[in-house]
């Protein structure tokens, strides 16, 4: 199987695309920039959905669905919002054989349509907070696309909340940011930096944007999630007011936040290898694959298959997500490689010797193929749990070690510091922690000269002392520690 996949070191982009297609995660559609998410890829998205949906409901959010067709006039109501998204609009001007009185935009994001509805639903302080989540599709007319990472249409969730006070809205924004961080690290086994975006990089229409930033194996950063504090911007644009306890009319404060199918791309790029996909157990649709190793004799094969069914039954009874591969036409080696390519965490082999010894042979996806051992059926469930937990931790630890090795600190300590910074960014990739004055000119020049952007003002380094620190470009007094990186 790995003979048909590009080398990660020689052609990272093709390696990624090979995994997407040959693991049957997605395929190209007839529409440029759009993808078909295949059943196995969609099962990963379904797993992401089920975990996050439960967490959203635990924090008081409800699901709803809003139209994907948005009147163009709605988007014009928030100036910054339309300026930020208008280049990516897909606009419908004709329908039903007639020209529309007002063009409709295919949903690029839902703030405007949702806040139009909130103006009808919110009248009193008793209506607040209003916390709604939507699972939907989005259309943004991207010029350069890549499956899962950047597509014209993609799936996502978007949360939209309304609050009586600024404090509540900011608290909600940061609560969701932390929820995303824990999800990324605890379930996807991807270490992330969290922090505030610069004014240049923030969401169009937000007061402030916070992001989750991860490092891929090609040492480029990927923005995995965002959470926005919207202030009063959309409430004023759509005249959303409530009567407070004193009878005064006030505008409501807002947040919005989201993640998308881009996370599947992140999973591939953080964990996978040249044998194919590697999935952390907690997010894998299939945790265990049981592969009977058939012989030529039908009588022996029946014993192997009956025993394999018993193994599957025992694992399902212990509430593992398990499947069996009963393909008699393909060789064991091909079936092993197929399971590896799909990234299934645990492979259990069942041969006639296992039947006779009341045992099975276990193999872990993230270990070398030599790492396999026999274990009795009686202790299988407990041992599998240990291996799955260990694999989850090991994948996170490996990704964290990789990020640590590829996060460098470069501060201004002399007149040549920026040239050293620029040379490093042009010759290497990864995160670079440095200092910034907060100036847009410096940010733009650094981006133009290095292709690196400010990914965020990271929370991890808030405790660091800025006394005596200077902007890496202009040498004026630094206001922030920032993370620079080239990114997707």
UniProtKB/Swiss-Prot annotation:
Regions annotated as coiled coil: none
GO MF terms held by the record: ATP binding; proline-tRNA ligase activity
InterPro entries, per the entry: aa-tRNA-synt_IIb, aa-tRNA-synth_II, aa-tRNA-synth_II/BPL/LPL, Anticodon-bd, Anticodon-bd_dom_sf, Pro-tRNA-ligase_IIa, Pro-tRNA-ligase_IIa_arc-type, Pro-tRNA_ligase_II_C
One GO cellular component, as annotated: aminoacyl-tRNA synthetase multienzyme complex
Sorted UniProt keywords: Aminoacyl-tRNA synthetase, ATP-binding, Cytoplasm, Ligase, Nucleotide-binding, Protein biosynthesis
Family that this chain belongs to: Belongs to the class-II aminoacyl-tRNA synthetase family. ProS type 3 subfamily.
Function: Catalyzes the attachment of proline to tRNA(Pro) in a two-step reaction: proline is first activated by ATP to form Pro-AMP and then transferred to the acceptor end of tRNA(Pro).
Listed name of the protein: Proline--tRNA ligase
Source organism of the structure: Borrelia garinii subsp. bavariensis (strain ATCC BAA-2496 / DSM 23469 / PBi)
Protein encoded by which gene: proS
């Amino acid at each position: 199987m790995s003979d048909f996949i590009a080398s990660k070191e020689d052609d990272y982009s093709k390696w990624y695309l090979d995994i997407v297609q040959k693991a049957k995660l997605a395929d190209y559609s007839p529409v440029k920039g759009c993808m078909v998410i295949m059943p196995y890829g969609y099962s990963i998205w379904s797993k992401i959905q089920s975990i996050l949906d439960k967490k959203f409901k635990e924090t008081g959010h409800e699901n709803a669905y809003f139209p994907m067709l948005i009147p163009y006039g709605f988007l014009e109501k928030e100036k910054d919002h339309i300026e930020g998204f208008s280049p990516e609009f897909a606009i419908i001007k004709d329908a039903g054989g007639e020209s529309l009185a007002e063009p409709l935009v295919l949903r690029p994001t839902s703030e405007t349509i949702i806040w139009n509805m909130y103006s009808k639903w919110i009248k009193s302080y008793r209506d607040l907070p209003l916390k709604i989540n939507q699972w939907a599709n989005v259309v943004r007319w991207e010029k350069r696309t890549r499956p899962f990472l950047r597509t014209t249409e993609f799936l996502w969730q978007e949360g939209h909340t309304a609050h009586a006070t600024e404090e509540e809205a900011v608290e909600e924004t940061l609560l969701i940011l932390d929820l995303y961080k824990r999800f990324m690290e605890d379930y996807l086994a991807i270490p992330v930096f969290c922090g505030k975006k610069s004014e240049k990089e923030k969401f169009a229409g937000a007061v402030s944007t916070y992001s989750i930033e991860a490092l891929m194996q090609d040492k480029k950063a990927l923005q995995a999630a965002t959470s926005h504090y919207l202030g009063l911007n959309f409430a004023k644009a759509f005249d959303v007011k409530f009567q407070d306890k004193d009878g005064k009319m006030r505008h409501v404060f807002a947040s919005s936040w989201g993640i998308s199918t881009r996370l599947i791309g992140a999973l591939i790029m953080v964990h996978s290898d040249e044998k194919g996909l590697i999935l952390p157990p907690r997010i894998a649709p299939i945790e265990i694959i049981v592969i009977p190793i058939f012989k030529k004799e039908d009588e022996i094969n029946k014993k192997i298959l009956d025993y394999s069914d018993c193994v599957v039954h025992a694992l399902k009874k212990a509430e593992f997500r398990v499947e069996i591969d009963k393909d008699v036409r393909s060789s064991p080696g091909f079936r092993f490689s197929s399971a590896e390519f799909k990234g299934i965490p645990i492979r259990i082999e069942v041969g006639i010797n296992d039947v006779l010894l009341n045992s099975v042979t276990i193999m872990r996806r993230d270990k070398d193929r030599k790492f396999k051992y026999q274990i009795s059926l009686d202790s299988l469930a407990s041992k599998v749990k240990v291996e799955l937990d260990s694999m989850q931790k090991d994948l996170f630890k490996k990704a964290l070690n990789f990020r640590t090795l590829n996060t460098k600190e470069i501060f201004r300590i002399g007149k040549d510091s920026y040239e050293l910074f620029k040379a490093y960014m042009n010759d290497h990739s990864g995160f670079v922690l440095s200092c910034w004055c907060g100036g847009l000119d410096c940010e733009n020049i650094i981006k133009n000269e290095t292709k690196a952007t400010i990914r965020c003002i990271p929370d991890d380094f808030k405790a660091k002392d800025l006394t005596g620190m200077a902007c890496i470009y202009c040498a004026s007094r630094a206001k922030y520690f920032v993370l620079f990186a080239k990114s997707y």
